[in-house]
């Protein structure tokens, strides 16, 4: 069994955003400002509630982040869709980290609940992705549940996050 890297720094994550980590045509993260985490603190193909693998990541919050001035003027909060996108980003990263081929695309989620906010006063956002299943067929499909914490309190939950890896068809 191959031992895979179990954590990633910001600089290493950026190599994934540039398409250098998993090879051309394979899973790729967005680059800043759409990259919604600074580091992956732990990633494993086993463990988690379903023993199918998990990812843990962190995002340092500072008052000068790009979304605060425009969402909303005078009442700054991080858009909820960015936290959800981070969960999809991490789900796709996991599939690439497993060595699965193809370009990642968010497909759907079951249920999403927002019970709190990220404001300029927040210091740290943490993400957890707990895999339920990885299906390998015409495409690779990852299905996971996710959560997001702001300064230690769970404020977002998402069930059945789905990300697919798609390979380009040969002409």
Curated annotation (Swiss-Prot):
GO terms for cellular component: cytoplasm. GO terms for biological process: unsaturated fatty acid biosynthetic process. Pathway: Lipid metabolism; fatty acid biosynthesis. It is found in: Cytoplasm. Its EC number is 4.2.1.59, 5.3.3.14. It holds the Pfam family FabA. The keyword ATP-binding does not apply. It catalyses: a (3R)-hydroxyacyl-[ACP] = a (2E)-enoyl-[ACP] + H2O; (3R)-hydroxydecanoyl-[ACP] = (2E)-decenoyl-[ACP] + H2O; (2E)-decenoyl-[ACP] = (3Z)-decenoyl-[ACP]. GO terms for molecular function: (3R)-hydroxyacyl-[acyl-carrier-protein] dehydratase activity; trans-2-decenoyl-acyl-carrier-protein isomerase activity. Transmembrane segments: none annotated. InterPro entries: FabA, FabA_FabZ, HotDog_dom_sf. Keywords: Cytoplasm, Fatty acid biosynthesis, Fatty acid metabolism, Isomerase, Lipid biosynthesis, Lipid metabolism, Lyase. The keyword Glycoprotein does not apply. Its main location: cytoplasm. It comes from the Bacteria. The active site is at 71. Homodimer. Belongs to the thioester dehydratase family. FabA subfamily. HAMAP family: FabA. PANTHER family: 3-HYDROXYACYL-[ACYL-CARRIER-PROTEIN] DEHYDRATASE, 3-HYDROXYDECANOYL-[ACYL-CARRIER-PROTEIN] DEHYDRATASE. Necessary for the introduction of cis unsaturation into fatty acids. Catalyzes the dehydration of (3R)-3-hydroxydecanoyl-ACP to E-(2)-decenoyl-ACP and then its isomerization to Z-(3)-decenoyl-ACP. Can catalyze the dehydratase reaction for beta-hydroxyacyl-ACPs with saturated chain lengths up to 16:0, being most active on intermediate chain length. This is 3-hydroxydecanoyl-[acyl-carrier-protein] dehydratase. It comes from Sinorhizobium fredii (strain NBRC 101917 / NGR234).
